[in-house]
C-alpha cells in the first residue's frame, strides 16, 4: 500500500486553503487543483492519524458519481488531467487522488438530504418530531426510512467549527428564494437517483450532503465531493433489518465506525469532549476504516 498522505505540500502552485480532507491549490485564475488527502475528520475535528488510501478511494468514488449523475446537474470537473499542472516531482502527491476543477463561487449552504432517520436527525426527531423544521410523522424509529427524502440544510462552518442546521427559510434569506428552490429540488433528485442505484448494489444511502457553487454565468454547479462515505451514511443492506428492529445504528461503510469508537473511548475516565486534540486511533481502527472505504467502492463500482 502506498504511504498515507496526511498533508500535501505542492510548491509549484499557490495553496488557497486546507479543508478537513482536501487541499486546494490555484491553477491560474479560473481553476483549482483539489488534492484529497488521507486525513479523516470526525465531529468536525481533524484526527491525527491518516487512513491509508482514503484520498484515492474518495476521489474514485466522487468521479464515479459525477459520471453517473452528470445528466441531472452540471459539475465542477474540467475533464483535464490533474497531473498536467504539477511538476514531475509532485506527481506522487497528486496521482489518483486529485481533481482539476472549475473555480466557482461557493454557496454557503450544505445541501443535506435525508432518506432515513439517523444521527443528529434522530436526536432532533425525538425532541421535536421534526428535523430542521420539517415536521415528520409520529412513531418513526432510529434508522427508519422516511416516507419521502427531506431537505435539511446546514450553514457551512469554518474548519474546526460545527456545521449548524438551518431552516429552509434561512436558506432563502442567504441565497434567495429562486436559488434555494433549485438547490432543494436538484439535491433531492440527485439523492433519489443515487440511492436507487446504490440499492441495486446492496447499499443503503441513508443521507448525504452536497455542495454547490455558481459558475461565471450564474449556473448552479455541483462541486467538492459527491456521495462519498465522508459526506454520506452508507449502510450495507445485510444487517440493516436486524439493527432497525433492535433500534440500533446499522453497520456502516462510512466513518461512523470511527465515530462510534470515539464516542466509547475514555480519557482519564471521561468521554472525549470533541475538541482538538483527538484521541489517537489504534492501528486496528485505522485498518478497519481503510477496509470499509475500499469495500464500499468495490461494491458500488464493481
UniProtKB/Swiss-Prot annotation:
SUPFAM superfamilies: SAICAR synthase-like (SSF56104). One of its GO terms (biological process) is 'de novo' IMP biosynthetic process. Pathway: Purine metabolism; IMP biosynthesis via de novo pathway; 5-amino-1-(5-phospho-D-ribosyl)imidazole-4-carboxamide from 5-amino-1-(5-phospho-D-ribosyl)imidazole-4-carboxylate: step 1/2. The keyword RNA-binding does not apply. The keyword ATP-binding applies. One of its GO terms (cellular component) is cytoplasm. InterPro entries: SAICAR_synt/ADE2_N (IPR028923), SAICAR_synth (IPR001636), SAICAR_synthetase_CS (IPR018236). Coiled coil: none annotated. It holds the Pfam family SAICAR_synt. Keywords: ATP-binding, Ligase, Nucleotide-binding, Purine biosynthesis. Its EC number is 6.3.2.6. One of its GO terms (molecular function) is ATP binding. It catalyses: 5-amino-1-(5-phospho-D-ribosyl)imidazole-4-carboxylate + L-aspartate + ATP = (2S)-2-[5-amino-1-(5-phospho-beta-D-ribosyl)imidazole-4-carboxamido]succinate + ADP + phosphate + 2 H(+). Belongs to the SAICAR synthetase family. HAMAP family: SAICAR_synth. NCBIfam families: PRK13961.1, purC. This is Phosphoribosylaminoimidazole-succinocarboxamide synthase. The gene is purC.
